[in-house]
């Protein structure tokens, strides 16, 4: 039995593995772009299959594609969407910047599979043509940007935002639970005036609430689809109703509010929607890094650190120090946030590098965008389940550090003035005295006045409620 078959494209014939559905252009790309290990993301492949399905449906409805072929293409696309044929999409991210080779990879796979579904063969004698049928009314230049937006919206809406909202609620619940625990605040990594543990955590929860709104604000632009613009945005070789209809079909299939882009020249020539969208993801990464760093600092110890909170002990932390447990979820979170920030730089460069009617950094952009979505969604789920839900206050340590802080002297500002209060703090620090002892030694207030005026629970403001 032959192990290869001949496939033909505009450059001639080439042998491809007989057991694979792809064709000539995919085989050429495999030969020419043997670069690293990064392959086209599965989310993008599925979005591309969905786009091809929608195009076949609309082309059939408009009378542009015979029903028999259109339905076979749709069945083949559904197989891809259901997880079949995962080895048929082997191409590297590092290929043509328009994604043409991956578009043709999908066209060839669907054409050969549709031919089989119709009782035909693979290869040059197939019953469905990759360009004339599967790619009808399309160009790589509008199909690939469309698939990018579909994959991005689906990833953000169905994976990232749900995990973000769960983590935000966990922190909001913790803020409420610990609203009455007064602790020392810190600025510049130095002691500051008191606040409650609930107030501190409420800041984290608010950061994530803002991130939800920032990310959601980027979705309308991402829901604009380039399909129908064809090669340069003019819609050459498409039916007048095609662009609107195919966007509506994609919206129906995904249950997302996709629309046809009002200006296809912008859709083809830029990656602005993804640049903007990833900017919001980078903002989320910045917030998560701050939260994770605060958590690991506050839980540092167990005996020689701050130790105001405890977090779950999930696994041994050292191969040499017995009993050591580390804040591993915080470390994983900060690392993935750093990667997202790096991805943002690459996306910005890619987005800024379009020329004339087409941006040709698209595989780079979508690879990094979808990686960031996966990292953030998975990271937030793990951080929530294995860290945030288990945050508990160490009340004795909180009280100890609160009572030792020299910054409680700030409560005296309105009674004896800043200069005298500063003198008390300096004397206490230099001579190892309590604030009360230093104040009384200087003769600035009585024992009773100190106890009345320096009350940490009265220093946390109206926000305690």
Swiss-Prot record:
It catalyses: (S)-malate = fumarate + H2O. One of its GO terms (biological process) is malate metabolic process. It is an enzyme of class 4 (lyase). GO terms for molecular function: fumarate hydratase activity. It comes from the Bacteria. It holds the Pfam family FumaraseC_C. The keyword Lyase applies. The active site is at residues 188, 318. The record marks 331 as: Important for catalytic activity. It is found in: Cytoplasm. Keywords: Cytoplasm, Lyase, Tricarboxylic acid cycle. Substrate binds at residues 98-100, 126, 129-132, 139-141, 187, 319, 324-326. Its EC number is 4.2.1.2. Its main location: cytoplasm. InterPro entries: Fum_hydII, Fumarase/histidase_N, Fumarase_C_C, Fumarate_lyase_CS, Fumarate_lyase_fam, Fumarate_lyase_N, L-Aspartase-like. Pathway: Carbohydrate metabolism; tricarboxylic acid cycle; (S)-malate from fumarate: step 1/1. GO terms for cellular component: cytoplasm. PANTHER family: ASPARTATEAMMONIA/ARGININOSUCCINATE/ADENYLOSUCCINATE LYASE, FUMARATE HYDRATASE, MITOCHONDRIAL. Involved in the TCA cycle. Catalyzes the stereospecific interconversion of fumarate to L-malate. Belongs to the class-II fumarase/aspartase family. Fumarase subfamily. Homotetramer. There are 2 substrate-binding sites: the catalytic A site, and the non-catalytic B site that may play a role in the transfer of substrate or product between the active site and the solvent. Alternatively, the B site may bind allosteric effectors. This is Fumarate hydratase class II. The lineage of its organism: Bacteria, Pseudomonadati, Pseudomonadota, Gammaproteobacteria, Enterobacterales.
């Amino acid at each position: 039995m032959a192990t290869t078959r001949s496939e033909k494209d505009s450059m001639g014939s080439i042998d491809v593995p007989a057991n694979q559905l792809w064709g000539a252009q995919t085989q050429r790309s495999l030969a020419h772009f043997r670069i690293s290990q990064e392959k086209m993301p599965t989310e993008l492949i599925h979005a591309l299959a969905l786009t091809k399905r929608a195009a076949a449906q609309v082309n059939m409805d408009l009378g542009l594609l015979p029903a028999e072929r259109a339905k076979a293409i749709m069945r083949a696309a559904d197989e891809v969407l259901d997880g079949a044929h995962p080895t048929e999409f082997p191409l590297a991210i590092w290929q043509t910047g328009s994604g043409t080779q991956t578009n043709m990879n999908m066209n060839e796979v669907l054409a050969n599979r549709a031919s089989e579904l119709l009782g035909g063969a693979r290869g040059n004698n197939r019953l469905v043509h990759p360009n004339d049928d599967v790619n009808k009314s399309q160009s790589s230049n509008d199909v690939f940007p469309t698939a990018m937006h579909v994959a991005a919206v689906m990833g953000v809406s169905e994976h990232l935002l749900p995990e973000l909202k769960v983590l935000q609620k966990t922190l909001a619940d913790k803020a409420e639970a610990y609203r009455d625990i007064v602790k020392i605040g810190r600025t510049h990594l130095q002691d500051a005036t008191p606040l409650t543990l609930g107030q501190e955590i409420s800041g984290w929860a608010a950061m994530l609430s803002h991130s939800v709104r920032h990310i959601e604000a980027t979705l309308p632009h991402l829901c604009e689809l380039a399909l129908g613009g064809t090669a340069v945005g003019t819609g050459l070789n498409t039916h007048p109703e095609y662009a609107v209809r195919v966007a509506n079909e994609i919206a129906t299939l995904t249950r997302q509010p996709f629309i046809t882009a009002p200006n296809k020249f912008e859709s083809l020539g830029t990656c602005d929607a993804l640049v903007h969208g990833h900017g919001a993801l980078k903002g989320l990464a910045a917030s998560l890094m701050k939260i994770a760093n605060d958590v690991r600092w506050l839980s540092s110890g167990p005996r020689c650190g701050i130790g105001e909170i405890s977090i779950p002990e999930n696994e041994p932390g050292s191969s040499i120090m017995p009993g050591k447990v580390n804040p591993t979820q915080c470390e994983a979170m900060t690392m993935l946030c750093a990667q997202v920030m790096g991805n943002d730089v690459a996306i910005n460069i890619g987005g800024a590098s379009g020329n004339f009617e087409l941006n040709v950094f698209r595989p780079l952009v979508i690879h990094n965008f979808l990686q960031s979505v996966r990292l953030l969604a998975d990271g937030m789920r793990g951080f929530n389940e294995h860290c945030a839900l288990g945050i508990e206050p160490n009340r004795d340590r909180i009280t100890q550090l609160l009572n030792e802080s020299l910054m409680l002297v700030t409560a005296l500002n309105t009674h004896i003035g800043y200069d005298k209060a500063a003198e008390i703090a300096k004397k206490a620090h230099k001579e190892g005295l309590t604030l009360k002892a230093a104040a009384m030694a200087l003769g600035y207030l009585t024992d009773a006045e100190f106890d009345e005026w320096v009350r940490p629970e009265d220093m946390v403001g109206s926000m305690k409620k």
